Design a protein with these regions (language model features):
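Active-site loop/oxyanion-hole signature of alpha/beta-hydrolase fold enzymes
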Residues: 34, 38-76, 106, 112-118, ...
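Conserved HGGG/HGGXW glycine-rich cap/lid loop of the alpha/beta-hydrolase fold
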Residues: 2-45
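Conserved hydrolase catalytic core segment
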Residues: 71-114
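Catalytic histidine-centered segment of alpha/beta-hydrolase-like enzymes
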Residues: 244-257
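Alpha/beta-hydrolase
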Residues: 137-218
Length: 269
C-alpha cells in the first residue's frame, strides 16, 4: 500500500519521540511520518528572532523528504511546529501539498503589532511561557521519579500514560547518575522569547500556494488568548475541534490521529 509522506514538527520542549504513539496511529492510517527529533538544537539552525533559521531547518528537512517522494509533501505541526510548517510553506512555494496547524492559532492584526512592541521592550520573557521554562525543574534521581513528578502536574495529568512514558524515556537523558531534561531549557526559553510577530506580513508577501487546515483543543488557553480571526481567514474555515487542552495530541493520540487523517484527506491527501 502506498504511504502518504507527512513531515511532522513538534511543539516547543516536546521532541518528536514524545509523539511516538500518535505517529504509530498515523502510520497505521497510511501516512509515512518523518520528523526532526529536536528543533533548535542544531548549531546550523540556531534560534533567532521570528524563527528564521528554524523555518529553514523544517524547509530543508521537508525538501529532503520531497526529493525522496518525487514531489511535494504534507506538513503538519503542533504549536511551534505548526507555525514553522506554515512559514516554510509560505517561503518555499511548491514544497508542501498542504499544511495542518495543530493548536497553532495564527497571530495577526493588532495582536501581532502588540507582540512586536512587547518584544522590542524586552518584556516578552515575563509574559510568555518563558517566565516558567527558564526555571523549570530539570533533574530527577531516576526515570520513575521523573514519571511521578510529571504525572501529578496539572499540564500532564490528562496525558495518555503511554505518551507520558515515552516523554520520560526520550525526553530525559542519563547524566551523572540522574535523569535530566533532554530539551535544553535555555533553548526552550529562547524559542518563546523570539516568537514571530511577522506572520501576517509574511503571508501577505508570500501568499500560500497550498490549502491550510487547523485542529484545536476546546480547552486550549493558547487558542483563546490568540483568537481565531486570522486562523479562520487562512484556513478558509477548515477547522476541527477536539476536546482537550493545548496538549491534546498527548492526551488523546488516537482521536488526534483520526482528526489529522480527516483534515489531510479533506485537503486531498
Amino acid at each position: 500500500m502506498h504511504s502518504t509522506p507527512l513531515v511532522f514538527s513538534h511543539a516547543n520542549s516536546f521532541q518528536a519521540s514524545t509523539y511516538s504513539v500518535l505517529f504509530a496511529h498515523l502510520r497505521q492510517r497510511g501516512f509515512a511520518v518523518q520528523a526532526i527529533e529536536k528543533l533548535g538544537h542544531d548549531p546550523h539552525y540556531p534560534v533567532s528572532n521570528n524563527w528564521k533559521h528554524l523555518v529553514q531547518q523544517v524547509a530543508d528537512f521537508a525538501k529532503a523528504q520531497a526529493d525522496k517522494a518525487g514531489g511535494p509533501v504534507w506538513l503538519a505541526g503542533h504549536s511551534l511546529g505548526g507555525f514553522l510548517s506554515l512559514m516554510a510553506a509560505a517561503r518555499h512555494p511548491g514544497l508542501a501539498k498542504g499544511v495542518l496547524l495543530i493548536d497553532a492559532p495564527i497571530l495577526g492584526g493588532w495582536r501581532s503589532m502588540a507582540l512586536g512592541v512587547i518584544k522590542g521592550a524586552q518584556l516578552v520573557g515575563s509574559l510568555s511561557p518563558a517566565a516558567v521554562s527558564h526555571k523549570r525543574r530539570n533533574t530527577w534521581p531516576s526515570q520513575e521519579a521523573a514519571y511521578e513528578h510529571f504525572k501529578h502536574k496539572r499540564a500532564f495529568s490528562k496525558w495518555d500514560d503511554a505518551v507520558l512514558r515515552d516523554y520520560i524515556a526520550h525526553g530525559t537523558v542519563e547524566r551523572d547518575g540522574k535523569r535530566v531534561l533532554a530539551f535544553d531549557r535555555e533553548i526552550e526559553t529562547n524559542i518563546y522569547n523570539t516568537i514571530p510577530d511577522n506572520l501576517d506580513r509574511l503571508l501577505r508577501r508570500n501568499p500560500l500556494k497550498c490549502p491550510v487546515s487547523f485542529i484545536g483543543g476546546r480547552q486550549s488557553w493558547e487558542m483563546k488568548r490568540v483568537g481565531m480571526g486570522m486562523t479562520e481567514k487562512v484556513t478558509r474555515g477548515r477547522i476541527i475541534m477536539l476536546d482537550g487542552t493545548h496538549l491534546f495530541p498527548m492526551e488523546k493520540p488516537l482521536a488526534t490521529a483520526a482528526a489529522i487523517e480527516t483534515a489531510l484527506r479533506n485537503m486531498g491527501a
